[in-house]
């Protein structure tokens, strides 16, 4: 059953309840059964009685992806984060004894196995390191179902609605959240497995045959499917909502997808972005909004986890509605568990407890733009003076510019020489009647104004060529940012004057 939070609950009551859940979780699950956190708390002298509230959570050190990475000295590092209960301790607990007396020893044993035995796994994508596995027990699958049901209910889905799941079939959070969400809500769902399983044509075929009311998937892949469907003259007038995950969703993406859906015969489509990560074993969604309306922010479930916002430099916990890095702590997880996990994601307007303007919900929300702190790259605009380039903003610039369909940013070295300067190259597909010259002018103008750097070259491609460049249907996440630089020396970015003779070329 879905655990409900009253819509009129206030910030104080939410925090008080989370404190009680946290205290119980640390005392009964994390400290006794997590090898990593038991050792950490013992070494640092952190007693379970010291953690009784959300504020007390700060006694625990922050964790990050580097804590999970295997090393030659410790090739089984990730196992230290798996909850590993002591059977004798569990058998002596009052709730276990009562369960055995009321329903028998076998039922009590099954209950404990459902709670603690890992039966399922997802993993990180492994773009910056080796994939990191995260294990789930039946308890975690129930949590995943609840988180998915929250998204479906927030999106206003009805029992008769049909869902087309275009997420790639893989041990990837987004695919399985969509699957378990539909199962828990008893909704019809066809999962295509994305491009690798059925290809773009297969997804278009299912789109026109099933006539889904809700389409879920990666923004880039959904764009390619809808774009090709329009080009082929296909029709689908049933789509009400697009639910997107796995990639950043900027305003320009929303407008493009909404326009494509309208060309297919589905006007006034709502676009919902979700935010989640493997380490949380769940995701959260915005309230539905028409493209052009401001985002409501991501609605959190305060019964399943605590979100803190910290200063990424000082690690100080910040107050509500203050920008900072997102830190997550589960409140009911089993299997793989990471406490106070630094996501590396920066939220521009922080955490709010105010009423959602669309859903009227009072649950906590993450508000504003989310960007990866790792996408602030140090590069050399000149040989002696470096500049921080915010690659997060490139999504907004390129998706918001009129006339650009899809795109790819490529970083490379001049002449492929590791000792040379960096080059920033844009690959574009022109969409609509806007001229190439005007698109180029707008790009250079926007890049200089916002990023203080200009692309070294702009190449225009046909749609099919861009699909190959982005590896649509071949990889888990389409490649919108491609770093082809050797990594043996520090990267530098080739200097551009304010009025360069920029290189452009059309590739057929």
Residue ranges and their predicted role:
Residues 29, 152, 229, 257-261, ...:
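Hydrophobic, Leu/Ile/Phe/Ala-enriched alpha-helical segments that form helix-helix packing faces
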Residues 129, 233, 314-316, 476:
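Detector for glycine-centered tight turns/loop "hinges" at secondary-structure junctions
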Residues 215, 327, 331-451, 476:
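AMP-binding/adenylate-forming catalytic core of the ANL superfamily
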Residues 4-7, 64-272, 280, 284-290, ...:
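Active-site phosphate/ATP/adenylate-binding loop shared across adenylate-forming ligases
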